[in-house]
Design a protein with these regions (language model features):
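Catalytic-site signature segments of enzymes, centered on catalytic residues
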Residues: 51-52, 118-204
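Active-site helix/loop module of the DD-peptidase/beta-lactamase fold
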Residues: 75-113, 166-202, 206
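A short, well-structured edge-of-sheet supersecondary motif
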Residues: 18-50, 278, 284-288
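Active-site Gly/Thr loop motif
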Residues: 235-286
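Active-site-proximal loop and beta-strand segments within enzyme catalytic domains
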Residues: 3-4, 9, 14-21, 54, ...
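Active-site-proximal alpha-helical segments within enzyme catalytic domains
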Residues: 155-162, 200-223, 275-292
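Short, gly/Ser/Thr-rich active-site loops of penicillin-recognizing serine hydrolases
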Residues: 297-350
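Active-site SXXK
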Residues: 38, 56-81, 108, 159-163, ...
Length: 350
């Protein structure tokens, strides 16, 4: 992304530096990209990590799934009140919980499919075949279909399967053709099941700048360089709070939309171990973060400082210089421990 010119930044550099420092205390940051009005105001990676090497996303990948559902809905090939099994009869096991008949596309999007556990990447990758059939064979909580939030990446994989069936292309193929290529993003990979469907809920490979760019696409209601890549109506619906996340009250992120998390002031995509896309509803700012430490406080910290930074006076030259110096010197600390004796070093090294 283009760099914002010095002196034109809206965000106060001193407060932005405070945010970076507090994030470092809270999480093992790997990389970050802060965009203001679609232009970079801070980006970097903590050595030995690099902005040029994509990392595997966990649930942040669900953003891509939601964008693809939006494409199918916009073309009239999928409707949110359709029943899931309208598209999956050929995937059903011989015996199954008949409460599956009640689950809609909307329920899958909002994690209200009556799941009794989270079928995550570990659960799925233990299977050598029949991912969808196996997931459909699990017991459901009938009373909570459509009215109880239970996070389950199986919902996301199922959406990926359904989109592929109705669109005739995988989610990755759709994104490459309609989104990534138009944004000049390089080759992006996404893991697939043995059946050839993208995993939906995890497995997309991104860098912090690419995360921020996708966040900016959402912030711009699906518009990129004057071209509508994804329906503005869908983007608006996607980031609306739909269901309260249990035990999240008081945090910047407290609700769930369509495969993304939401709050009063921000929308967000979050992946395990501190992967974040954070977009501000009323401020033209988006942040992409990768890290190695799970922490729900990351979004809280970003919201706190960005709201302060936009209200603060213009940055001084001293503040800008300090921020640039920090950007140039990012490095993870060496782990604690005693020096290895030389003879042991050579023994291990061989």
């Amino acid at each position: 992304m283009e760099r914002k010119k010095a002196g034109e930044e809206m965000l106060n550099a001193g407060i932005l530096l405070e945010m970076i420092k507090e994030l470092e205390q809270e999480a093992e940051l790997h990389s970050i990209c802060v965009l203001e009005e679609g232009k970079t105001v801070f980006e970097g990676a903590w050595a030995p990590y690099s902005l040029r090497v994509p990392q595997m996303m966990h649930s942040l990948s669900k953003t891509g799934t939601s964008l693809c559902v939006g494409m199918a809905v916009s073309e009239g090939k999928l409707f949110l009140d359709d029943y899931m099994l309208d598209y999956l009869r050929d995937e059903l096991p011989v015996t199954y919980d008949t409460t599956l008949e009640k689950i809609t596309i909307r329920d899958l999007l909002t994690m209200q499919a009556g799941s009794t556990f989270c079928a995550n990447n570990v659960w799925f990758t233990r299977l050598t075949k029949d991912w969808e059939t196996t997931w459909l064979g699990q017991k459901r909580n009938a009373d909570e279909i459509g009215n109880g939030f239970h996070y389950d990446s199986g919902c996301s994989y199922t959406l990926s399967v359904i989109v592929s069936k109705v669109m005739g292309k995988t989610c990755l193929e759709l994104l490459k053709e309609r989104v990534f290529s138009k944004m000049d993003l390089p080759e992006i990979n996404w893991l697939s099941s043995p059946e050839g469907y993208n995993t939906g809920g995890w497995g997309m490979y991104l860098t912090a700048p690419w995360i921020a760019a996708l966040g900016w696409l959402i912030k711009q209601n699906g518009m990129w360089n004057g071209e509508q890549l994804v329906s503005a109506e869908w983007i608006s619906d996607m980031v609306k709070p739909r269901v309260q996340i249990p035990e999240a009250a008081g945090h910047a992120i407290d609700s769930y939309g369509y495969q993304v998390k939401t709050g009063e002031k921000i929308f967000a995509a979050e992946g395990a171990f501190g992967q974040f896309m954070i977009g501000f509803r009323e401020i033209p700012v988006v942040i992409g973060i990768t890290s190695g430490t799970a922490s729900e406080k990351i979004a809280d910290i970003c919201q706190k400082y960005i709201l302060k930074a936009v209200e603060a006076p213009k940055s001084t030259e001293e503040e800008r210089t300090a921020l640039r110096k920090k950007e140039a010197d990012l490095c993870l600390p060496m782990p604690d421990g005693e020096d290895v004796p030389e003879e042991l070093y050579w023994k291990v090294k061989g």
